[in-house]
Amino acid sequence: MNFVFLSPHFPPNYYQFAVALKNQGVTVLGLADENYDSLRPELKAALTEYYRVGDMHDYNELVRALGYFTHHYGKLDRIDSHSEYWLETEARLRTDFNIPGIRTNQIDRIKRKSRMREAFIKAGIKVARGRIVKDLKDALKLVKETGYPLVAKPDVGVGAAATYKIHHEIELKAFFDTKPPVDYLLEEFIKGRICTFDGHTDREGKPVFLNSLEYSAGVMETVLDDALIYYYTLREIPEDLEALGRRVLEAFDVGERFFHFEFFREDDTGGLLALEVNMRPPGGLTTDMFNYACDIDVYNAWASIIAGKGFPYPEYSHKYYCCYVGRKFNRDYSHNEQEIFQAYGDKICHHESISGVFSRALGDYGYIVRSPELEDVIEAAEFIQEQ
């Protein structure tokens, strides 16, 4: 089996996907613009061959690379990066080289937030009031329905990038004076907490691994206010969230992929609203958190499914609450690293520096903490972030 891994070096922890594929007997073909010598040794050892291009955004270079791989290794069976950024590129390459997976005719409904909304509504799933707006006049019509505050986000975008919270008409006018020339979705601001329905499906689209995350704060607020965030896996997925998550799975026909679905749980009603879908693993160190929460290896599980051997952990369970805790270097904290490890060293599974691309949301340094008790991980998170 031949697997083309786009940008296998990033995010840094995703090299483990390539290692797991090799361990399953798959031929792993790396494709990126990174210098080969800068790849970590474990990734080099996992790759059968690495093809370096001058620019990953030059589609013709990518086509030549896949042509080279096809000539030397035969039919290409899969291509992926596990990155939102390359979803469209992957889909185009799959279409042009007849590789199974998401194709170009499917990409809009998993990239455009407006198309996601349409799918949610068609499936009978509640969403925040809002729509694509053309101009200020159109936006003011929407305000009559929703009131302020509003959230403005690009129809195509990742995370909280280029997202704004608008409190009144002056800010709304300023937004239209300065917004980029792309479609923007305006929605009512929902007071609530983000929760997720995550997992992986087998080749038939059946979910074989499930997880849910809860966040201490919204990612948008964290980025806009330069705040701190922690988030944690749950040991049990709430029934209403799982029921809704499974409906979203059916609506989007997810096969042989990780998925990361985001919802709001409203403060006043406790009800759920669908926010967006992501056809990739949750970001940051979350895949490692899955491992620590369940004492399994999700990299191996994914590779086993790709290799046609099925999900290897049918009896898995969430043994721990597992929490990611971020710290930013522009803070004066109450506790230094030595004090953190003295207090919670028995619960800290992992800690590392975070790539600058993610630091605005996740912090410059991250700790992963686990315990069978939720109170323990929240207490540790608050201790680590105390200022």
Where are the predicted features?
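Short beta-strand-to-turn element immediately C-terminal to the catalytic PLP-Schiff-base lysine
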Residues: 133, 163-168, 200-202, 231-232, ...
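Peripheral (often C-terminal) accessory segments that flank ATP-dependent C-N-forming ligase machineries
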Residues: 301-387
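Conserved ATP-binding module of the ATP-grasp superfamily
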Residues: 126-128, 145, 149-152, 161-196, ...
